[in-house]
Amino acid sequence: MDRKILTYDSVEISFGGKAVIHDVSFSLEHGEILGLVGESGSGKSTLIKAAVGLLGSDGLVTRGDIRYMDQNILDIPEKEKRKIRGAKIGMIFQDAGASLCPIRTIGEQIYESMCAHTKITRSEAKTRAMDLFDKLNFKDSQRVWDSYPFELSGGMNQRAGIAIAMLMNPPILFADEPTSALDVSVQRQVVKEMLKLRELFGTAIVIVTHDIGVVRAMADTVLVLKNGKTIEYGTADRVLDHPQDPYTRKLLEAVPKLQRKVRV
């Protein structure tokens, strides 16, 4: 039985007619964590945005296929893509605080987000949110629910963003540089929480990062990008411990901030 939940097949992405992603292929199984690594500008974020229709008016997948289960995402109408985005593929951004509405409480935003995908009462939404907050070891769930984003720390906003992305229990989570704006202690907490999601729900995760330490702590497989091209792709142990390409070896020179011992 084919367990692939997401497949990129020879994908090329262009902006203004110029290709920036070249012939990239990878697949993701249920519960797998893929680390997408490379320097800034290598095309990491562009790759995941293509799957959820966030390339903007100038961006276009010009070759290849992106399949969720057996469905080619590129062939479906925008209305159907919106159903996949959030309900089937959740997203966490680098700065969750910036993506949250500053004039609505976290609780209000959770309720509105869930209403976009399912019929649910405010009470039911709060119950589900509080349950997930507790599973992710939030110390003061009620305070988070009642707070505006500006009343929370950057780290707490990021953790709330993870919870919001997961409340519909999407099978796939895209995490775009989720730890880069955080100090090391909060990085560890966020990594633990994403690993906890995999443990609780079998969530498959694509994490975009330039931090090799985060990749070592989380990933089962690793894809290294440079200038929109695949440099290496394989198991985390093989790519990180026995890199074949000089570019990968250069990336690994940085001392990792996190170790695999944070895996839950």
Residue ranges of each PLM-predicted region?
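Conserved ABC ATPase signature
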Residues: 147-152, 156
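Conserved ABC transporter NBD signature motif
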Residues: 60-72
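A short, surface-exposed alpha-helical micro-motif characterized by mixed small hydrophobic
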Residues: 215-217
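ABC ATPase "signature
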Residues: 233-234
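A short, proline-enriched helix->beta-strand linker immediately N-terminal to the Walker B motif
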Residues: 167-171
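The feature captures the beta-strand-to-loop junction immediately N-terminal to the Walker
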Residues: 37-39
